[in-house]
Amino acid sequence: MAIKKYKPITNGRRNMTSLDFAEITKTTPEKSLLKPLPKKAGRNNQGKLTVRHHGGGHKRQYRVIDFKRNKDGINAKVDSIQYDPNRSANIALVVYADGEKRYIIAPKGLEVGQIVESGAEADIKVGNALPLQNIPVGTVVHNIELKPGKGGQIARSAGASAQVLGKEGKYVLIRLRSGEVRMILSTCRATIGQVGNLQHELVNVGKAGRSRWKGIRPTVRGSVMNPNDHPHGGGEGRAPIGRPSPMSPWGKPTLGKKTRRGKKSSDKLIVRGRKKK
């Protein structure tokens, strides 16, 4: 999809861009694949705020996506490419030969009328899902499982992909976009190709109200708060932090502090860590 620019008729329109949605072929979703999506506003089941900057936004319905791709041996025809408000990638409605309909993540190059399939015998073609042990080295993949049968968890957002680097025993080496090289069980499934909607990262929101439509609330700096609200708060004028390192609102070190849990069981599966920026 191409990037659409706007004339600067207002301050909000100046520098604003959006996608032209040329790839979208159908605007109304499949009703049988919709579920209600109640607003949480960043609260947990106790009503306590657990995620800041969430709240409001346009009403949405959840599209049930087939991340498992476990319907083997039956061809499916791509019926339409649709917009999904719950993710950055577009989704494709596929209709199987037995009449069942499912949504899948729409990879780059997938077209209406194309046939997709899943299973160990599937061809190495964009949109097909296979076990990693059946995918040739060097192939670009997305929607990768971490546990067999659990469904794809890695490389699902717009433009995301990973590459098969090699095979060692019951594991397959995968290089992620972060530069991390990881071992994944060869029986886990992945889908061929790169996730579509590559231009998504180039969109300029343009104004605060557009973020509010998405349910994103303002982020306030700690330095402009009072000392009872944030460790950075207080002082006269633009005062420094007054601490050895930046702190989170709860007084924990942040901005560079490692947050991954130590001695995690999957550490032994990471061959090379992600690249430093």
UniProtKB/Swiss-Prot annotation:
| Disulfide bridges in this chain | none
Q: Does the keyword Ribonucleoprotein apply?
A: yes
Stored SUPFAM superfamilies = Nucleic acid-binding proteins, Translation proteins SH3-like domain
SMART domains, per this entry?
Ribosomal_L2 (SM01383), Ribosomal_L2_C (SM01382)
Biological process GO annotation list?
A: cytoplasmic translation
Query: Where are the residues of the annotated region Disordered?
Result: 36-55, 213-277
Keywords from the named record: Ribonucleoprotein, Ribosomal protein, RNA-binding, rRNA-binding
InterPro entries per the record? NA-bd_OB-fold, Rib_uL2_dom2, Ribosomal_uL2, Ribosomal_uL2_bac/org-type, Ribosomal_uL2_C, Ribosomal_uL2_CS, Ribosomal_uL2_dom3, Ribosomal_uL2_RNA-bd_dom
Which GO terms label this protein's molecular function in UniProt?
RNA binding; rRNA binding; structural constituent of ribosome; transferase activity
Q: GO CC terms for this protein?
A: large ribosomal subunit
- Assembly, per entry: Part of the 50S ribosomal subunit. Forms a bridge to the 30S subunit in the 70S ribosome.
| Function according to Swiss-Prot or TrEMBL | One of the primary rRNA binding proteins. Required for association of the 30S and 50S subunits to form the 70S ribosome, for tRNA binding and peptide bond formation. It has been suggested to have peptidyltransferase activity; this is somewhat controversial. Makes several contacts with the 16S rRNA in the 70S ribosome.
For this chain, the family text in UniProt reads: Belongs to the universal ribosomal protein uL2 family.
Q: This protein is called what?
A: Large ribosomal subunit protein uL2
